[in-house]
Every structure is written in structure tokens, then in C-alpha cells.
Amino acid sequence: MKLTCMMIVAVLFLTAWTFVTAITSNGLENLFPKAHHEMKNPEASKLNKRCVPYEGPCNWLTQNCCDATCVVFWCL
């Protein structure tokens, strides 16, 4: 009985995981071309660039904020 319940939970979890990854598959499709481009041109890699955290001073020309938008020289 316990094994049957564990199998049912595992199948439900894997089914949910499949649906979640299917929704975000567009992000995965673009992963490899970007990585290939970065291998050809290491300077284009985002790992080499430093970003400014939220509410830090930024450059509005280069938009160097990590997860925000540069507004009036501040990452917001």
C-alpha cells in the first residue's frame, strides 16, 4: 500500500514537472545558441559583466542594473 502511494505521488510530481518545463521551454530553446555565441566571443558573455544591485547608481546608457531598470541614474 505504501509503495503504491509513493508511486502515485512520484507520477503526479513528474507529470507536474513536465507541464512546468513545457511552459518555460522557450527559455530553454534559446539557451544553447547564446552559449555557443558566448563560446565564440567570450567578451559577449554576461558572466564577465558586472551589474549594479537594486537602488544602486547606474549608467543609463549601458543599462547595467542586475534585475531592475536604470531610472535617473538609479536602479529601480
Swiss-Prot record:
Record GO terms (molecular function): calcium channel regulator activity; ion channel inhibitor activity; toxin activity
Tissue expr: Expressed by the venom duct.
Family: Belongs to the conotoxin O1 superfamily.
Entries under Pfam families matching the protein: Conotoxin
Coiled coil: none
Name of this protein: Omega-conotoxin-like TxO5
One term under GO cellular component: host cell presynaptic membrane
Source taxon at top rank: Eukaryota
Disulfide bonds: C51-C66, C58-C70, C65-C75
Role summary: Omega-conotoxins act at presynaptic membranes, they bind and block voltage-gated calcium channels (Cav).
Propeptide feature ranges: 23-48
Signal peptide span: 1-22
Keywords, sorted A to Z: Calcium channel impairing toxin, Cleavage on pair of basic residues, Disulfide bond, Ion channel impairing toxin, Knottin, Neurotoxin, Presynaptic neurotoxin, Secreted, Signal, Toxin, Voltage-gated calcium channel impairing toxin
Domain comment as written in the entry: The presence of a 'disulfide through disulfide knot' structurally defines this protein as a knottin.
InterPro entries given in the database record: Conotoxin, Conotoxin_omega-typ_CS
Subcellular location: Secreted
